[in-house]
Amino acid sequence: MTQREEVDLPDFCRKPTLILGCGNTLFGDDGFGCELVDYLERNHSVPEAVCLLDVGTGVRKLLFTLCLSSVRPGRILVLDALDVGRAPGEVLEIDPAEIPPVKLDDFSLHQIPTSNLLRELEVHCGVEVRVLACQTGPLPGEVRPGLSAAVRAALPPAAEWVAREYFKTD
C-alpha cells in the first residue's frame, strides 16, 4: 500500500481498536448499540487509539471495507441488541464463533452477512472480534424511538464494561 493510499483510509481502518454501535434507534430496544455509543461519548474519555462509531444499520458496508483493506484494527467490539430469550436488559458477551448456525437467522447483528463478515475478519484477517449485546424487550411493530426502562438501565453497567476492557491506558 502506498503512503497516499494509507493516508486516504478512514480512521476506522487505522485505529488499533474499533467499537461499533449497531441498531435502529427508531425501533425501541433495537437501538441499544447506538445508544451505548452515545452514552460512552457523553460519560467517558475515549482514548486516541479507539475509534467509536454509531453505525446504525450500516455495519455491513464498513465490515466489507475492513475485509478488503490491508490496514485494519487489531480488535473490534460490536455493541448490539439481540433476542435470545433472556430477561430484557441483560447484557452478555457473545463469541462470534459460538453463534449457533440455527440462531444466525435470529441474531440481530443485522443478519447473516454481518455475522459471516465478523468471522471472516477474525479467522482470515487476524482481528480480535468481540460482541457485547443486550437482550431486548418486545420490539415495536411500528416506529417508536427510545429504549425500554430495562434496556436503558443496562447502559451504565455496559459502558463501564466497555471502558474497563477497551479504554485502559496502561
Question: Model-predicted segments: where are they?
Answer:
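Nucleotide and nucleotide-moiety/phosphate-recognizing core
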Residues: 12-19, 27-29, 34-97
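A short glycine/serine-rich beta->alpha loop
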Residues: 22-26, 103-106, 144-146
